[in-house]
UniProtKB/Swiss-Prot annotation:
Biased composition (Acidic residues): 259-268, 279-291
Protein name (Swiss-Prot/TrEMBL): NBPF family member NBPF15
InterPro entries xrefs: NBPF, Olduvai_dom
Gene name for this UniProt entry: NBPF15
Tissue expression per record: Ubiquitously expressed with a higher expression observed in breast and liver. Also expressed in neuroblastoma cell line.
PROSITE patterns: ODV
Other information: Encoded by one of the numerous copies of NBPF genes clustered in the p36, p12 and q21 region of the chromosome 1.
Taxon lineage: Eukaryota, Metazoa, Chordata, Craniata, Vertebrata
Length: 670
């Protein structure tokens, strides 16, 4: 029996066919791809066969390079396509990541914008509440109101910029508008500077803090919109804080006192030098001001180490000023006394200044003399000078005691015997001013070597010390001779001492007490330094010569007096030369020599004795003048020999040479 196929069997067959078709489709695609590849290979093989055939006809070597080049280019082209596809895939992946990140940032920015709008609204409400005129007592000035109004305007502008409608505005427009508002706010502030008052610092700080806190959330933004918003906030904060600092600076400028400005002007003029101050105060000022000025230290005691080398020079200048003040006071006091009364006999005087110095009271001068010159505290670099000042102080005390004793002794002698003239010599052509005896005694009793000389002047200081010692020795010899003469005068007629007449003018008599006071002054109490030891021996030798000379003079005087008693006057008349027609018992003339025929003023006896007692080697000569030293020593010996063995003509020549040598030494010390 034949069974007919039903509908179910037909449906199953269709389902199987469809499934088979679906399974075979990918296989078909694969087969097609394989077929294509085979076609390409076949094409290549055909091409190769064609080329092989063509190669047979032509040379194989010529086509071989072309085939290699074509195959290489085909490979490169395929590799480039694959690389481009890979790059595009990677770029798409990166863009996708960036797009997702931007979407997240946009959502965050929208949230921040909402928060910023809320904060700006709250700030605006707060500022408006501050500006309300309901409470005038709490208002803090017109300037503060202007600043708060400007802050309100800036916050409103910020709200407008943060709105979504204005999100796409350019940054340049924002900057221009903010700059215009800042200029407008600064203009009324400059117009009202006169009415400004000090604004409390706390209110300005609160304003700046509120503004900065209200815009704080925008600091964390990083994209383009974030930078735009932070720029706006920085503008607001900078304008508020900058304006407050500017106002504070102006207030500080106005608060500066006028005294400080005056001090600044004085400082700009510069400090006045101490020399100019002393010159300005030197005219018509009482002596007390001088004492205060000279007793004040011109240099601070605590100096830097770098200035220690200069401190010694400053102190030496200070000491010179003290010495000059003392000499000026003495000279001026002598001139005042000379105008009031006439002096008995002029002495040697030295004019220190050509201009008139201010008059000074005697009590102030005594205060100046009694003030120790070494009261200034010297630094360590000035230690060599300190000992000299202490020695001078001791010398002043010793001189005061010696002066009192000498005055008492001289008062007794004045009651017994008259004064006797001394050895005289006239050095100057002009008349010298008469000076009171007391002031001159004080001047001559002052040590000549008042200031300690520096190291360069050590040769001269030794000479000065030796001369001081000579004065002391001569003063003692003169006192001895004077006593001998007084004893002889009691027995016979008075006889003058050894004298030398240079001119025919009669010499004025001077009080004996002042002269003895001058010669009895021990001015050589200062010890010589170690550097002067080579010169000391030579001066001691000269000192011995002078002592011997004084003793020989005493012997000659005694012999002369004995001859006078015996009637031997003829030889002495020849020595006298020009003096004739005297009485039966004329005084015995001394040695004399005439140097000049011009009339010259007379000089006191003590100054000439000092001149004759001065050795020709007053200033020590350097090593380059060694050849001339022997000549000077020979002159010195001639001086002594002619003093003992009197010859009028040779004595005159010797004294002339010594006088010239002495003047050359004084004028040209170096």
């Amino acid at each position: 029996m034949v069974v007919s196929a039903g509908p179910l069997s037909s449906e199953k067959a269709e389902m199987n066919i469809l499934e088979i078709n679906e399974k075979l489709r990918p296989q078909l695609a694969e087969k097609k791809q394989q077929f294509r590849n085979l076609k390409e290979k076949c094409f290549l093989t055909q091409l190769a066969g064609f080329l092989a055939n063509r190669q047979k006809k032509y040379k194989y070597e010529e086509c071989k390079d072309l085939i290699k080049f074509m195959l290489r280019n085909e490979r490169q082209f395929k590799e480039e396509k694959l690389a481009e596809q890979l790059k595009q895939a990677e770029e798409l992946r990166q863009y996708k990541v960036l797009v997702h990140a931007q979407e997240r940032e946009l959502t965050q920015l929208r949230e921040k914008l909402r928060e910023g709008r809320d904060a700006s609204r709250s700030l605006n409400e707060h500022l408006q509440a501050l500006l309300t005129p309901d409470e005038p007592d709490k208002s803090q000035g017109q300037d503060l109101q202007e600043q708060l109004a400007e802050g309100c305007r800036l916050t409103q502008h910020l709200v407008q910029k943060l709105s979504p409608e204005n999100d796409n505005d350019d940054d340049e427009d924002v900057q221009v508008e903010v700059a215009e508002k800042v200029q407008k706010s600064s203009a009324p502030r400059e117009m009202q500077k006169a009415e400004e008052k000090e604004v409390p610092e706390d209110s300005l700080e609160e304003c700046a803090i509120t503004c900065s806190n209200s815009h704080g959330p925008y600091d964390s933004n990083q994209p383009h919109k974030k930078t735009k918003i932070t720029f706006e906030e920085d503008k607001v904060d900078s304008t508020l804080i900058g304006s407050s600092s500017h106002v504070e600076w102006e207030d500080a400028v106005h608060i500066i006192p006028e005294n400080e400005s005056d001090d600044e002007e004085e400082e700009e003029k510069g400090p006045v030098s101490p020399r100019n101050l002393q010159e300005s105060e030197e005219e018509e000022v009482p002596q007390e001001s001088w004492d205060e000025g000279y007793s004040t230290l011109s240099i601070p005691p605590e100096m830097l180490a770098s200035y220690q080398s200069y401190s010694s020079t400053f102190h030496s200048l200070e000491e010179q000023q003290v010495c000059m003040a003392v000499d000026i006071g003495r000279h001026r006091w002598d001139q005042v006394k000379k105008e009031d009364q006439e002096a008995t006999g002029p002495r040697l005087s030295r004019e220190l200044l050509d201009e008139k110095e201010p008059e000074v009271l005697q009590d102030s001068l005594d205060r100046c003399y009694s003030t120790p010159s070494g009261c200034l505290e010297l630094t360590d670099s000035c230690q060599p000078y300190r000992s000299a000042f202490y020695v001078l102080e001791q010398q002043r005390v010793g001189l005061a005691i010696d002066m009192d004793e000498i005055e008492k002794y001289q008062e007794v002698e004045e009651d017994q015997d008259p004064s006797c003239p001394r050895l005289s010599r006239e050095l100057l052509d002009e008349k010298e001013p008469e000076v009171l005896q007391d002031s001159l005694d004080r001047c001559y009793s002052t040590p000549s070597d008042y200031l300690e000389l520096p190291d360069l002047g050590q040769p001269y200081s030794s000479a000065v010390y030796s001369l001081e010692e000579q004065y002391l020795g001569l003063a003692l010899d003169v006192d001895r001779i004077k006593k001998d003469q007084e004893e002889e005068e009691d027995q016979g007629p008075p006889c003058p001492r050894l004298s030398r007449e240079l001119l025919e003018v009669v010499e004025p008599e001077v009080l004996q007490d002042s002269l003895d006071r001058c010669y009895s002054t021990p001015s050589s109490c200062l010890e010589q330094p170690d550097s002067c030891q080579p010169y000391g021996s030579s001066f001691y030798a000269l000192e011995e010569k002078h002592v011997g000379f004084s003793l020989d003079v005493g012997e000659i005087e005694k012999k002369g007096k004995g001859k006078k008693r015996r009637g031997r006057r003829s030889k002495k008349k020849r020595r006298r030369g020009r003096k004739e027609g005297e009485d039966d018992n004329p005084p015995c003339p001394r040695l004399y020599g005439v140097l000049m025929e011009v009339e010259e003023p007379e000089v006191l006896q003590d100054s000439l004795d000092r001149c004759y007692s001065t050795p020709s080697m007053y200033f020590e000569q350097p090593d380059s003048f060694q050849h001339y030293r022997s000549v000077f020593y020979s002159f010195e010996e001639e001086h002594i020999s002619f003093a003992l063995y009197v010859d009028n003509r040779f004595f005159t020549l010797t004294v002339t040479s010594l006088h010239l040598v002495f003047q050359m030494g004084v004028i040209f010390p170096q």
